C-alpha cells in the first residue's frame, strides 16, 4: 500500500501543471574507491522517509520529503517521523517498484567538501535536517540538472583528469549522468611523484627482473673485457709478425749485398 501511495505522489508531482521537474532514471555513476554527495538539491528532489531497524513511519506520516519553493526561497516540505515497531515485520520499505523508479542513494563523504555553494543558488535546498530514528542511509530521487561531487575514500588519493562531478542531463528524451573524470589510487601507489627520490633497495631485496638486469650488465662487462684482451693479443701478434718481416727483409738485403760484393771481387781478380 505504501509503495502505491509513493508512486501516486511521484506521478502527481510530475503531472501537476507548472512542475517541470524530470526525475533521473539512473543512479549517479559509481567510481571505485570513491563516494558522491550533493552539496544542494534542486527543487523537485525527493527523499524517502526511512527508519532504522526496529522503527517505522507513523501511520499519518509523510512518505517522503520534497524540495519545493519559489525564485527566492526553497525548503523541504513534509516531515519524516518514526516510531517503535510493534513487531519485527511491521517495518515496510517506502520505495517505488524497481521497474518504475530506481532508488537514489548517497553516502557520507570522508571529509567535508564545498566546491560550489549551491545552497545559496535559487531553486536549491540545503541538506535536509535529520529526524529521530532515521535510517543510516538516505535514499534520494534526483531530478534533471542535479549535480553530485565525488571524493576518494580514506586511504586513497585522487588523480584528477577533469572535473570530479556528475550532472543529470536530458538527452533525446532520456536522462543520463555525465561521467566524472576521477581516478582513486592507493597512497602507496601514488607516493612516487616526479621529483621524489626513490629509496635505494639492497640487491637481496630487489625483484628478480632487477637481479637479472644486474647479471646481464655484469656479463656484458665481462664480455667487453674479454674482447679488449683479445684485441690486445691480436695487436701484439700482428706487431710481432711485422717485426719478424722487417728482420727477414733486412737479412735478405744483407745476403744479397754480400753475394753482389763477392761477384765483384771475383771479376776484379780475373781482370788482374
UniProtKB/Swiss-Prot annotation:
Which processes are annotated in GO (biological process)?
Answer: activated T cell proliferation; activation-induced cell death of T cells; apoptotic process; cell surface receptor signaling pathway; immune response; inflammatory response; inflammatory response to antigenic stimulus; interleukin-2-mediated signaling pathway
Q: Which GO terms describe its molecular function?
A: interleukin-2 binding; interleukin-2 receptor activity
Tell me where it mainly resides.
Answer: membrane
> What ranges are annotated Extracellular (topological domains)?
22-240
Residues that span the membrane, as ranges = 241-259
Disulfide bond annotation, renumbered to this chain = 24-168, 49-80, 51-82, 67-125, 152-184
Instruction: Write down the glycosylated positions.
Output: 70, 89, 218, 224, 229, 237
Subcellular compartments = Membrane
Keyword Lyase present in the record's keywords: the answer is no
Q: Which residues form the signal peptide?
A: 1-21
In what ranges is there compositional bias, type Polar residues?
87-98
Where is the sequence biased in composition, kind Basic and acidic residues? Answer: 195-209
Q: Which UniProt keywords apply?
A: Diabetes mellitus, Disease variant, Disulfide bond, Glycoprotein, Immunity, Membrane, Receptor, Repeat, Signal, Sushi, Transmembrane, Transmembrane helix
Membrane topology field: Single-pass type I membrane protein
| UniProt-annotated stretches for the region Disordered | 87-123, 190-212
The role this protein plays is: Receptor for interleukin-2. The receptor is involved in the regulation of immune tolerance by controlling regulatory T cells (TREGs) activity. TREGs suppress the activation and expansion of autoreactive T-cells.
**Subunit comment for this entry?**
Non-covalent dimer of an alpha and a beta subunit. IL2R exists in 3 different forms: a high affinity dimer, an intermediate affinity monomer (beta subunit), and a low affinity monomer (alpha subunit). The high and intermediate affinity forms also associate with a gamma subunit.
PANTHER family the UniProt entry points to:
INTERLEUKIN-2 RECEPTOR ALPHA CHAIN, INTERLEUKIN-2 RECEPTOR SUBUNIT ALPHA
Protein name from the UniProt record? Interleukin-2 receptor subunit alpha
Please tell me the species this chain comes from: Homo sapiens
